[in-house]
Structure formats: structure tokens, C-alpha cells
Amino acid sequence: MKKIILAAFMAACGLQMSAQQNLFVAQDLESAIVNKDNTVTFNFKAPDAKKVQIAGDFAERAEGQHIGGMVGAGLIDMTKNAEGIWTYTTKPLDSELYSYEFMVDGVPTIDPNNVYVYRDFATTSNVFIVGNGKADLYKVNKVPHGTLAHRWYHSDGMKMDRRINIYTPAGYEQSGNRKYPVLYLLHGMGGDEDEWTTFGRAAQILDNLIAQGKAEPMIVVMPNGHAAMEAAPGESSLGYYKPYHMKNGTMDGAFETYFPEIVKFVESNYRVQADKAHRAIAGLSMGGFHSANISLNYPD
């Protein structure tokens, strides 16, 4: 038995050492480098590739061109140097959050030299932020920070527990009996409860606007608008699976019908001003459709 335990221990140590070694591999190549003049430089090492292109929402798209899962992305040819590194530098870009991916001999590929990757339902892309403008609101700045909680509520109507993200402003925990207005913020067809806080940078924007006095401290509730889903892919009891659009029940009205369950959960667990004057709802695309229907059916 001692020999078995020792062998298992040594095997575990070997795995750990292998994993640790990866931390010290030289990472000389950088990509999505935002330069001082707001140009951005991309680098990708693929000496055997015949053609490498970059697909990004900063590139002009040719008529009829569709790049993987990236809506509005155009294709730009990259240039290979003698070391097999493909490179491209953009023109100066406006201040914004941008997404992109590489096309290596026609195959969509994530940039391995940029660890910042977002998932938009079933597709992934690298992202970067060009500052010196409105995108400074998307950054983590030295301001008081709110709290983003991943909560679960039970839906009797949908017969499941469902995940929901709730932002509370800086100082909420120390504010005694103070009550806050609440915004219900709904995502689009390709999103889930995580969309507004990843791609949307909602928590950072709220922190910055509240700190600047441009927004009132508020609670923001971000549920999952796909009625058939417990939670975002990888966060539910289904485990890791390949996401796909338009699950059964997505647009059958169930989310709108049982929306009062979300309001009840929020008002039972958070100090909100629970009246029509201090309650708002907004959404993007499908979320706008949901917002309109919920407002018509529940005008309070």
C-alpha cells in the first residue's frame, strides 16, 4: 500500500512539475499591441502557412463577405517575414473595444499571443481595447468598484433553478437601509447572463459612470433570456457542451411570462426601490423584444 501511495504521489508531482514548466516558457511574441498613436500591431508565428489573414470588426468588409461567426468583420492579408512571423499593423483606430481572429489557410484561429478571449454564445474571438476616448469607460480604472454576484433563483414556471448576474454599486454593503433603483438589462439572441459583463463590460462602465457622477448608483440585474437554459454554457448542470443558437423555447414567450419571478427574487434579496418610478428595463436585439413585451404585459 505504501508503494502504491508513493507511486501516486510521484506521478502527481510529475504532472505538477510539467504544468509549472509551462509557466516559464518564454513568451517573446506579443500580439494586439496598442501603440501610442492608436495603431494596433498583430503577430502570428506560422512559418509553414501559405496565407494568414486577420478578420476583425475594425476592418472593412467586402460586399457579401462573411467571416466565421464574426458579424461585420472584414479580411486583411498579413505579411510574413524571414522568421515565419506574420504581421499586420492597422491604421489609427477610434477608441473602442474590438474583436478579431486569424484565418490560417482558411481556418479560423484564435490568436495564441493574446490571452483575452470572449465567447459570444457558440463563437470565440480575441479582444483588445483602444483607449484615449470613450473606451476608457470599459477599462478598470482607479475608482470605487461595485460587486458582481452570480446568483441562482428558482423558477416555478420554468421548473428549474436559473443563473442570474446582479451588479451592486460601490458602497452597497455599507449603506445601511438605503434603497437603490434597479435596471433589468437583457441580452441579445447570441448572449446569455454573462454577455453584458464580458463583451458588454457593464460592471466597468457602471463603476466609471457612477464615480464620475454621470449615473446614479443602481442595482443592475442581468438574467438569461433563453427560457430553456439554466445558465450560460459551462455554468449549468449540463456541464461542458457545444452551444448552439435557437434552443427550443427561446422565443415562445416563457421568459416574458415568468419574468415577475426575477423581480420577486431581486426585491426579496436586495434593497431596491420597489416601485414603477425606480424600476427600468432595457435590452439589446432579442433583449429589446423581451423588454417591449414585458413592459406591455407588466407596465409597473
Task: List PLM regions with ranges.
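Bacterial Sec-dependent N-terminal signal peptides
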Residues: 1-21
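Non-catalytic cap/lid and distal C-terminal segments of serine-dependent acyl enzymes
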Residues: 34-300
